[in-house]
Amino acid sequence: MNLKGLDNDEIIKLLEENKIEVKDFIDSSICPTCFDKENNNIIYGNKKDVMLYEDNDIECFLISNPRSNGHIVISSIVHYKDMMEIPDELCEKVFVFAKLMMNIIKNVYDCESVYLCT
């Protein structure tokens, strides 16, 4: 569903009615992590209980509405419009961290494979 042109209240209502999901934000060029932070954790829920890692650059947390067991979000603390804007050092940090987390998830959940989506 295209969310462009909708105000926050309309988007929040659609979320509460389970009529949209994270992919709808991404498809509409709306950062779901920023929307979540700006709207009282409406998408991912209270991250304090599920925060796996946080530092000055990145955060990693389990989401409250996972697509599968072990579904995590790794995001930069600073918002970037797209990956082209991310400084190389931060991009490297995110991907090295993602690889570490993918190995942990694979072992914890005995997965055959783990996927990284941007």
PLM regions with names:
Residues 94-108:
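Active-site helix/loop of acyl-thioester processing domains in fatty-acid/polyketide metabolism
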Residues 72-95:
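Short histidine-centered catalytic/ligand-binding loop motif
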Residues 1-80:
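Active-site microenvironments that recognize anionic phosphate/pyrophosphate groups
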Residues 109-118:
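A short glycine-rich, hydrophobically flanked beta-strand micro-motif that places a catalytic Asp/Glu
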